[in-house]
């Protein structure tokens, strides 16, 4: 088993819609994911989430709500510990991203698009508030 990679993900939400990134690079190429990425040395998960949001969307948010930690364990090289954050916004304009295409998608649409299986629990937690 490989060493776990540590990442921060930020779910950006506007009412019932989520701003998701259709990735053009690995990991999860061709799948819709929250924005985020790996932590840098000596960086807190929250600072990493803010940095990744800005790098991938150009947006800045100060108020991020911590939702929990998602641990993925696999016999492959896909092993992650991800700190999950939520930001609720009134922004509707879709920014451009070098990481792929950003889209506002309703929660009901998410089950019909390609997403990592582990992300289902993230969206369900945010919608159900538990």
Identify the role of each PLM range.
Residues 128-130:
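C-terminal regulatory/oligomerization modules of transcriptional regulators
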Residues 1-19:
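Conserved N-terminal beta-strand and adjoining loop/helix that marks the start
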Residues 39-62, 72-125:
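Unchanged
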């Amino acid at each position: 088993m490989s060493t776990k990679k540590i990442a921060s993900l930020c779910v950006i939400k506007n009412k019932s819609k989520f701003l998701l990134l259709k990735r053009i690079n690995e990991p999860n190429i061709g799948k819709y994911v929250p924005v985020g990425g790996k932590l840098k040395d000596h960086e807190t998960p929250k600072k990493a989430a803010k940095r990744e949001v800005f790098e991938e969307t150009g947006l800045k948010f100060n108020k991020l709500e911590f939702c929990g930690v998602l641990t993925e364990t696999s016999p492959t090289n896909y092993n992650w510990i991800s700190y999950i954050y939520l930001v609720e916004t009134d922004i509707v304009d879709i920014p451009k991203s070098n990481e792929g295409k950003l889209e506002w998608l309703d929660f009901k649409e998410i089950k019909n698009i390609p997403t990592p299986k582990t992300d289902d629990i993230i969206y369900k937690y945010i919608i159900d508030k538990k």
